[in-house]
Amino acid sequence: MNWFETNKGLINLARVDWIEYFTTSTVFHFTGGKMEILGNENETQEFRKQLKTILKQSR
C-alpha cells in the first residue's frame, strides 16, 4: 500500500484521484470527498517534497 502520513492522518495514495497544489495548501481528491492539508508556504513546500519522494518510490 502507498500510505502517506499527514497532520490529518494517513492517506492511501492508491485511492487518490488527483492532487491540487496551492501556495499554502495541498488538496487530495478521492471518490466521494477530498482532504485539504493547510500550512504556511514553507510547511507546504516541505510537505510536497516528502510527497514527491513517496510518489517516486511507489512507481
Which ranges hold each PLM region?
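Acidic, Ser/Thr- and proline-rich intrinsically disordered linker/docking segments
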Residues: N2-L10, R15-R59
